[in-house]
Amino acid sequence: MPVTDTTEKRFEDDITGYLLSEGGYTRNADIYDPKLGLFPATLIRFVQRTQPKTWARFVNMNAVEPERKFCTVFNNACDMDGLLHVLRHGFKHRGISFRVCYFRPESDLNQTDAGHYAANELCCNRQWFYSKHNHNSVDMMLSINGIPAFAFELKNQFTGQSVENAKR
């Protein structure tokens, strides 16, 4: 009878493998910016692809470092309205409305809505170093369009770990 690998790494491998093969996720090759709390290149790419005219207006109004400015404006909107609200409804800046993700349309009749939904980038990252203050990490993080949405520690009862270990 083969020995079952019950290590945390194997657990991570299994979850990551499933998300990549069956869940529509990819690995995020872009660089995470802990100061912004985002994968800025991923978020900017999504906005440029799905809202090119809106992005052009924003760049015209913010000619110096528009990408950095956009990420700052996004973070300010999240601080004011909350991340879930911004994910669901987007945000406005100086009269310009932005969406940072699109939900599944009720039908595929509207090709624009279907295309926007298909443009979402779902990514999983392992050993996510989230802090600008230290080198702490969590086992896995899921993001949508460069926005960290769900981070979690994996613990395995077969190795004697519990939720208490994750709290440390």
Where are these regions (language model features)?
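An alpha-helical interface "stripe"
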Residues: 1-168
